[in-house]
Amino acid sequence: MAAQRTYLAIDLKSFYASVECVDRHLDPLTTNLVVADASRTEKTICLAVSPSLKAYKIPGRARLFEAVQRVREVNAQRLQTAIRQNKAVRGEDGKYHFASTSFDANALNTDPALGLSYIVAPPRMQRYLDVSTQIYKTYLKYVSPADIYPYSIDEVFIDVTGYLPYYHMSAHDLAMTMVREVLYNTGITATAGIGTNLYLAKLAMDIVAKHIPADKDGVRIAELDEQSYRYLLWNHRPLTDFWMTGPGTVKRLEAHGIYTMGDLARFSIHGEDRLYEVFGVDAEILIDHAWGYEPCGMEQIKSYKPSTNSISEGQVLTCPYPNDKAKLIVREMAEILMFRLTEKKLVTESITLEIGYDRENVDKG
């Protein structure tokens, strides 16, 4: 039997927004900020929302106008509170106003006379890549590149099995040491999950850590093994919180009366064949994950190569385009794809075009 391994999953908290706050010498945990290109109208997507602004129920991938609308709603409630407490200011027009506004969560929490404001920071992708590289180099001070898998610009998996006896540390202590150094060097807070496999490390970070108190720096570290996973998460809902379980999969599971991972595990005991009928080879992954198993380790995910290649090109237009202009955009994107195929020495047998329509114009017919 193979020795049990220990994995870390580390996620940089609201990474793009945190970088923008730090570069402005502001606290990423208490500064209200969105990363969005306001020049592309309020329909542009927010690439990141700071934690304090998320606390007002603004999702991380909201459209800018949705953030504007939610802030307006919050300020309407705050103004009523300020009026009741005789802290609002009556202007020359006879209407009540806030005495001032603030984008700092601490100030807003202590003074109801302040209106909620926020910073709109234009995205700077090269800057985010530079900071991500700096943080990756911090991890390399503790582990070998062979034991790190960058999952995204702000998230990594690390196999720390062999390092725990070397450093005479627990997984929690090693995770905290690395996260603390990232915070010290960059000002960016991270969340970590510890698991006996990659899947459990990811869930510890994504789900369990969100429900434990943060330390004074906003750091959260959670741990899972197979037994604690079943105890803590078999009844957790919604299923979409679980890694690699999307809305389409969840809809098909619910059609079979499966609403939790515990339901799925129990169903698999006698209904395994039915799961394979519905999900094909993906049923194996679903069943493994329901029980807290994950057979792939660091070596397998680093050596994985897809059986097929795909490349894509996309644009978010700043306003509705008529047919002739849209045709020009599509032609330009097709030419870019052609050049990229040539560079990679690839050919294709399939081209897919997806077009999203402006909601207002669709409603108008």
Give residue spans per PLM region.
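DNA-contacting surface of Y-family translesion DNA polymerases
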Residues: 9, 241, 249-365
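Gly/Gly-Pro- and Ser/Thr-rich, intrinsically disordered tail segments characteristic of DNA damage-repair
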Residues: 1-288, 296-298
